[in-house]
Amino acid sequence: MEIRKENVDVVIVGGGPAGLAAAVRLYEQGIRDILILERETHLGGILRQCIHDGFGLTRFKTTLSGPEYAQRFIDQVKELGIPYVTDTTVLEVSRGKVVTAVSSGGLVQWQAKAVILTMGCRERTRGALGIPGERPTGVFTAGVAQAYMNLYNRMPAK
């Protein structure tokens, strides 16, 4: 398999609120060669499932729900023309700032001058943490339960 190779000034790993804010701030500081890499299909990260309000008071001077707050940043990224790639999983970031990722288009390596890691929080299962035991059917992490209710309008385990 051939690996496509590209150069970019800054690679931002993670298209959630921190990654989007970092991209916008870099652009405001005059840095234009930026690339956001996001594992999920949509930008916005955890904010997409935080339907309560209370976001945005500091940055946007108004209270917003999580999806509204994320959309403000997404709109800024699009308006500024900052490139992003979704459905892309970063496999490795080398000491030499080479970011290797895979997507449906295959393997890509970006040689960056700087890499910003903004992967946010991600719940890990008991097994991923190496805690022995069994997990009964119908037991969900808080994040999974929240996603079922707020993103998919379904009650967990129904």
Go through each PLM region and give its residues.
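Beta1-alpha1 glycine-rich phosphate/pyrophosphate-binding loop at the start
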Residues: 8-68, 157-158
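FAD-binding core/adjacent interface of flavoenzyme oxidoreductases
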Residues: 1-13, 71-157
